[in-house]
Amino acid sequence: GCIPAQKDKPWPLSFAVQDPTVWGISITSWAAQKAGLTINGKVQSVRHTPANLVELAHVPSAPLAKLLDRMLKRSDNLIADSLSRALGHYYLKRAASYAAGADAVRGILKNKAGIDLGSALLADGSGLSAHNLITAKQMLEVLDYIALHDDELKLIGLLPVAGMSGTLGSRGSVQNPPLVKNVTAKTG
């Protein structure tokens, strides 16, 4: 993306948290201190919630359909990375990580679509890493599967449309006929 040279407000940026446990402990300690609370003991992460704890707050995630819509329309890499890690946790019952996410994607594509990613390297969920390596044939197999099974997957309707939505909404190269309103694509 582009950042304007003259900007009077801070530019909002989002980044994937590399270690959610360390971040969670750090942000909890910081927030308690800012609120004037004293913590007697150690802030720590637990794998299982002890029965005697009382939930003070709960923040539910947006529904998956909304997350996918935002991720695809706005090219939201933070959501892509987070969903990849969560997929690894949910599908494989392992700690959420990029490696677990990559293994889950491989397993799902193999079991559901018959697509073997073989030697492909999946380093993150967003595709930003230079270590992501996939052949054109493998990518085409995935895209063909999505196109042939979109009645079930419902992904194509979430993609940006030239001149209308998301990252293609104001992209100059697709603002004129015959492309405007006729190109549905994922940028990046």
What are these regions (language model features)?
Residues 39, 166-170:
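Short low-complexity stretches enriched in small and charged residues
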Residues 122, 159, 183:
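Short clusters of hydrophobic/aromatic residues that line enzyme substrate/ligand-binding pockets
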Residues 54-60, 172-188:
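Short, Gly/Ser/Thr-enriched beta-strand-loop segments that form substrate-interacting elements
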Residues 49-51, 100-101, 163, 176-180:
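A short linear-motif detector with a strong N-terminal bias
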Residues 149-166, 174:
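Active/binding-pocket-proximal capping segment
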Residues 20-21, 150, 170, 176-179:
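Extracytoplasmic
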Residues 1-153:
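A small/polar active-site loop signature that marks catalytic segments
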